[in-house]
Regions:
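Long, low-complexity segments enriched in small/aliphatic residues
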Residues: 1-47
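Long, contiguous, secondary-structure-rich segments that constitute the structural scaffold
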Residues: 44-60, 64-207
Length: 207
């Protein structure tokens, strides 16, 4: 049925399958993910210079969305979908379409992974939108569960999720949520003493 309906030789617009089963009044925004050019998962994430530039990600939103939802640039906010929610920091950008929010994915990591300490920005401020995306569509009226994927290629529908955003409470911790227990060291993986790179030699009392 999917191939018969959507596998057309000419491109045409159709409403994403997940959106048809989502309350778009409650979840009015489209959420997208991109990748920073310099880093993806472990690729280049151990470069000390790059980590100073972008050691964690933000949720980029239009200033109009922030004004409508009562939060400012740099605030901690919640981004919520029908499947889950994430607490993160926001960043205003006029380049973001008001009906859309987006972030760099693959920067948020659990403490302990790749030698990151519990104080690392990746673990305390970085986040993933994966927690908001389901592998299955909401059940139909008959209770049927269908894969949340492109109807033709089968690619996971990462760009189809709908969300809402709102300001985090003043008493909430200034760390991303959800948080996970630090990953244990693997056998033979010992703690290493940190070493400064050459470009910071002479700082912090180091000669």
């Amino acid at each position: 049925k999917r191939i018969e309906t959507y596998f057309d030789p000419l491109p045409f617009y159709y409403e994403p399958l997940e959106v048809r089963l989502t309350d778009t009044q409650r979840y009015p925004l489209n959420a997208l993910t991109q990748r920073p050019m310099a880093m993806y998962h472990s690729w280049d994430s151990q470069n000390a210079w790059l980590r100073q530039i972008h050691s964690h990600n933000y949720l980029f939103v239009s200033p109009r969305v922030g004004a409508a939802n009562g939060f400012d640039d740099g605030d901690w906010i919640w981004v919520e979908s029908p499947h889950g929610k994430v607490r993160c920091m926001c960043r205003f950008s006029e380049a973001v379409e008001p009906g859309t929010v987006w972030t760099w994915n693959a920067i948020g990591k659990a403490a302990g992974s790749w030698g990151l300490t519990a104080r690392a920005d990746e673990a305390r401020k970085g986040f993933l939108l994966n927690h908001l995306i389901s592998e299955e569509l909401p059940p139909t009226e008959c209770g049927e569960h269908v894969s949340n994927s492109d109807p033709v290629t089968g690619q996971a529908a990462w760009f189809d999720v709908r969300v809402r955003v709102y300001k985090a409470g003043p008493d909430e911790p200034k760390v991303t949520s959800p948080q996970f227990s630090p990953m244990p060291l693997l056998p033979g993986q010992g703690k290493r003493r940190g070493r400064w790179q050459a470009y910071v030699a002479g700082l912090f009392g180091q000669k």
